[in-house]
């Protein structure tokens, strides 16, 4: 199952140093039956975009609670076995899931991160005009430099 983990630069740096996301369980976002019903579509691309957007909103909340980390949203896309994902949807969060296991780096598919120029807007809570940029896994260490 493709999951979207909300993160920050600090969380991403720790995952890279530790070889993955080791402090399970995690709140993540995914294409769920509840998300399908809420959006009324079976378009996988649209559903994945919505799940990633929900993770980006959660990343912004994490940033608000972590003023010492760079003000750039981070969403990590990963493939995990269905058996480690539990439903955690709510009316206001139809894509939310709970990941009950560690997510090793080998399961990470990509990361989606705000451009550095977006940081002032992100810090001020104005994220709606900023799309996340896609980064391949081999680019992640350079992203943090």
Name what the model sees in each region:
Residues 28, 55, 74-78:
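Generic structural hydrophobic/aromatic packing signal, biased to beta-strands
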Residues 67-74, 78-145:
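Glycine-rich, aromatic-bearing surface loops/beta-hairpins
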Residues 1-44:
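Long, hydrophobic N-terminal alpha-helical segment
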Residues 43-58:
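Short, structured active-site "lid" loops
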Residues 22-26, 48, 94-98:
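Short, low-complexity, polar/charged sequence segments that are solvent-exposed and flexible
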């Amino acid at each position: 199952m493709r999951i979207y983990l909300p993160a920050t630069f600090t969380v991403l740096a720790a995952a890279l140093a530790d070889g993955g996301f080791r402090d399970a369980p995690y709140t993540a976002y995914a294409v769920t039956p509840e998300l399908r019903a809420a959006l009324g579509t079976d378009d996988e691309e649209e559903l994945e975009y919505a799940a990633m957007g929900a993770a980006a909103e959660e990343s912004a909340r994490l940033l608000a609670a972590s003023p010492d980390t760079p003000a750039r949203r981070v969403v990590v896309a990963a493939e995990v076995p269905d058996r480690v994902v539990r439903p955690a949807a709510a009316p206001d969060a139809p894509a939310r899931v709970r990941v009950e296991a560690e997510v090793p780096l080998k399961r990470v598919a990509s990361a989606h991160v705000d451009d550095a120029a977006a940081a002032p807007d992100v810090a001020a809570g104005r994220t709606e005009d900023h799309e996340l940029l896609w980064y391949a896994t081999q680019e992640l260490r350079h992203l943090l430099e």
